[in-house]
C-alpha cells in the first residue's frame, strides 16, 4: 500500500480522494499509478524538449483517408500510454523519436483517442522501421496479421504524404540581445 501511495502522490493524483487513498483493487490501482508516474517522468526526461520539437517539425505528416487517420506522437507520455494499451514496447522510444526515428499513431477517424496501430519511421530515409498493433500481432501464442485496410492506408500515406514531405530545418535559437 505504501509503495502505491508514494507513486500516486508522485504522479500527481488527488490524495484527498478516498478512492485514491483506499482503492478497492490495490493491484489495479498500483498499475495505474505506476503508468501515471512513468508518464509524468517521460514528459520531464532529458529528451522531452527535443521530442516535442521533433513532433512539431513532423506535424505535416498528419493525414486522414477512408475513416483512418495518422498523427505524430506529441509527448513522451503518449508513448508510455500507447505501449500500455497495445502491450508493446513503444514507451521506451522517446530518445529515438527525438533523434528523428519518429512514432506516429494510426487510428480510426471516429475514435482518434483510441490506440490501434503504432508506426515508426526514419525521417531522414523516409523508411518504415516497424508497424505494430496489439501485442506486436501476437495473441494467445498465435501470430496475427496486420489489418489489410491499415496496410493499404500506410501505403497510400507513404505515396501521398511521406514521399512528398521534407523534414523542416530545426528552428534557429534566438540570440540574446546584449
Protein language model features and the residues they cover:
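Glycine-focused motif/segment detector
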Residues: 1-178
Amino acid at each position: 500500500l505504501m509503495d502505491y501511495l508514494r507513486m500516486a502522490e508522485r504522479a500527481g493524483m488527488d490524495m484527498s480522494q478516498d478512492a485514491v487513498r483506499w482503492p478497492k483493487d490495490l493491484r489495479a490501482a498500483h498499475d495505474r499509478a505506476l503508468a501515471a508516474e512513468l508518464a509524468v517522468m517521460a514528459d520531464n526526461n532529458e529528451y522531452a524538449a527535443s521530442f516535442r520539437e521533433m513532433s512539431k517539425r513532423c506535424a505535416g505528416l498528419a493525414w486522414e483517408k477512408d475513416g483512418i487517420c495518422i498523427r505524430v506522437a506529441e509527448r513522451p507520455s503518449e508513448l508510455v500510454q500507447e505501449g500500455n494499451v497495445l502491450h508493446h514496447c513503444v514507451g521506451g522510444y522517446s530518445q529515438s523519436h527525438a533523434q528523428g526515428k519518429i512514432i506516429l499513431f494510426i487510428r480510426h477517424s471516429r475514435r482518434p483517442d483510441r490506440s490501434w496501430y503504432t508506426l515508426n519511421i526514419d525521417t531522414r530515409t523516409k523508411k518504415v522501421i516497424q508497424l505494430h498493433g496489439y501485442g506486436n500481432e501476437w495473441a494467445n501464442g498465435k501470430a496475427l496479421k496486420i489489418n489489410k485496410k491499415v496496410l493499404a492506408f500506410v501505403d497510400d500515406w507513404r505515396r501521398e504524404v511521406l514521399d512528398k514531405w521534407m523534414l523542416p530545418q530545426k528552428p534557429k535559437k534566438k540570440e540574446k540581445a546584449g
